[in-house]
Regions:
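Metal-dependent enolase-superfamily TIM-barrel catalytic cores that perform enediolate-based chemistry
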Residues: 61-79, 86-88, 100
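Single conserved hydrophobic/aromatic residue that forms the stacking wall/gate
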Residues: 1-7
Length: 189
């Protein structure tokens, strides 16, 4: 699994790594390929940029597609076997990433969003809408990851299943952390 933020995310957080985006992506995929020893697929991982799209922010949708496209090109050239677009909170960013990948290659694309306990993303998208839109754009798998733990994934997955004609992914985390007697604990449920 190769996980590197987009050039925009790296530059805006001022880590001084924007000029190493291509190198880091290539190296991560090479290391992953070496570790897999031909026994596993290597996924190029993309996630949120941390930027707000217009009209909330200044970033235009077309420019965001180009950011993801630049990263996708490098990952394809480096030998990625598939793409995982994950932990997304914005359907618009998901759309931009899928469009960018589709413009670059025909590798499989798995897309997963993270949902709040109310069953919507941070930006208000429900699972049914996300499923219909992302599979119509060519996603090969639609799903949910992280969020607030396994129990809160049941209803969103059921809603996805009503419309999905592609496989559904559910990849929970340990839930939200809680502090008990000064110790962080995860009450998975």
């Amino acid at each position: 699994l190769s996980l590197v933020g987009s050039e925009m995310c790296i530059r805006d957080r001022e880590y001084g790594l924007a000029d190493r985006l291509e190198e880091m992506n290539r190296e991560l995929i090479a290391l992953s390929k070496k570790a897999a020893q031909g026994k596993a697929l290597v996924a190029a991982d993309m996630t949120m940029t941390g930027q707000q799209l217009y009209p909330i922010g200044d970033l235009m949708f077309e420019d965001l597609v180009e950011v993801y496209k630049e990263q996708a090109k490098v990952m394809v050239e480096a030998g990625a076997d598939l793409f995982v677009v994950e932990t997304m909170m914005s359907l618009q960013e998901c759309r931009a990433a899928v469009i960018a990948i589709k413009e670059v290659c025909d590798l499989p694309i798995m897309v997963s969003l993270t949902y709040n306990p109310d069953g919507r993303t941070l930006y208000g998208t429900d699972p049914s809408t996300a499923t219909v839109i992302l599979q119509s754009l060519g996603a090969d798998v639609i799903g949910i990851n992280c969020s607030t733990g396994p129990e809160d994934m049941i209803e969103p997955v059921k809603k996805m299943a009503e419309y999905a004609v592609i496989p559904i992914l559910a990849k929970p985390n340990a839930g939200l952390p809680e502090l008990e007697n000064g110790v962080t604990v995860y009450k998975t449920g």
